[in-house]
Swiss-Prot record:
Keywords: Carbohydrate metabolism, Cytoplasm, Galactose metabolism, NAD, Oxidoreductase. Its main location: cytoplasm. This is Galactose 1-dehydrogenase. GO terms for biological process: galactose metabolic process. The keyword Oxidoreductase applies. It catalyses: D-galactose + NAD(+) = D-galactono-1,4-lactone + NADH + H(+). One of its GO terms (molecular function) is galactose 1-dehydrogenase activity. PANTHER family: CONSERVED EXPRESSED OXIDOREDUCTASE (EUROFUNG), CONSERVED EXPRESSED OXIDOREDUCTASE (EUROFUNG)-RELATED. It comes from Pseudomonas fluorescens. Belongs to the Gfo/Idh/MocA family.
Length: 304
């Protein structure tokens, strides 16, 4: 069977550190071209735009998008119109209205698959939680924007800020919990010179009134804190390192060694083979609702 010929749109830090290594490690894919206006990707043909890649590049079967959500919708639509399978980084696009069109496409078996929660410990955590009585959830997602997005002004555009990494936590939690979540209240702390929050406190619940709290911080310091703690009547489950580590009642559990992006591309391969889609907008809805109901608190200006 011939490998899936893949084009990549965007070649920033995440693409370089995560996507390209995962693609190269999966024999089901071969990276043949990249569209980037920055540094070129070595070993493949590089183009200035998706249109140029599709028109003048080698044939591709699928496109993976590693671009900011603003402006991504038109690019994804262009790839879908060209009949390409599509993999989209979370958040899939900038608004729920645009994402709704992809859900309709999913019903028509269009191949559109935003990344969801594929960190190594997630499957084991979900299995353990399936037979437990949930009591509360605490999310702490804190990192240094200067480390992960140095000089990237797009991160402060409306709808992003600390929610750019925070949606990763929401993707994991909504994947783990059996019922949909709803935002009850939020406090968004916005630097006086930015459009989006540098920190946020969010209170959520589900139809059974499960207490879910989240603390997001984009100015946390060099050492990241990416943890989710779920208290149950039968014990406490904790995920650390963004879902790479799993502990139950303080005891570290053995989990799969497969990395998140390796699992993402394995899932993408399966979707292409099955001619199906995986479109999940609940994390984006929670972000949108946080902006909708959240109080805005102005804090000191942020300088990179």
């Amino acid at each position: 069977m011939q490998p899936i010929r893949l084009g990549l749109v965007g070649y920033g830090k995440i693409a370089q550190d995560q996507h390209v290594p995962a693609i190269n490690a999966n024999p089901a894919f071969t990276l043949v071209s990249v569209a980037t206006q920055g540094k070129p990707c070595p070993g493949v043909e590089n183009f200035q735009s998706l249109g140029e890649l599709l028109e003048n590049g080698p044939p591709v079967d699928a496109i993976a998008f590693c671009t900011p959500p603003q402006g991504r919708f038109a690019l994804v639509q262009q790839a879908l119109a060209a009949g390409k399978h599509v993999l989209v980084e979370k958040p899939p696009c900038a608004t729920l209205g645009k994402a709704a069109l992809w859900i309709k496409r999913e019903q028509a078996s269009a191949p559109c698959s935003p990344c969801i929660a594929y960190a190594p410990a997630i499957a084991a955590a979900r299995d353990w939680l399936a037979t437990r009585t949930l009591q509360s959830v605490q999310i702490d997602w804190k990192e240094d924007v200067r480390k992960w997005h140095p000089g990237q002004a797009w991160i402060w555009q409306p709808g992003l800020g600390v929610f750019d990494p925070g949606i990763n936590a929401l993707s994991i939690v909504t994947h783990l919990l059996p019922l949909p979540l709803f935002v009850e209240s939020a406090e968004l702390r916005v630097p006086s010179n930015c459009q989006s929050p540098i920190a946020a406190s969010i209170k959520m619940s589900d139809p059974r009134l499960l207490d879910v709290r989240a603390e997001f911080d984009f100015d946390h310091g060099h050492d990241e804190l990416w943890s989710i703690q779920i208290r149950c009547a039968e014990g406490t489950l904790r995920l650390d390192n963004g879902g790479a580590l799993l502990s139950i009642d303080g005891v570290r559990q053995t989990v799969a060694e497969e990395g998140e992006y390796a699992a993402v591309y394995r899932h993408f391969q399966q979707l292409i083979g099955d001619k199906t889609s995986d479109v999940d907008v609940q994390p984006l809805r929670l972000v949108a609702d946080s902006f909708f109901v959240g109080s805005r608190v102005s804090v000191e200006a942020f300088y990179d």
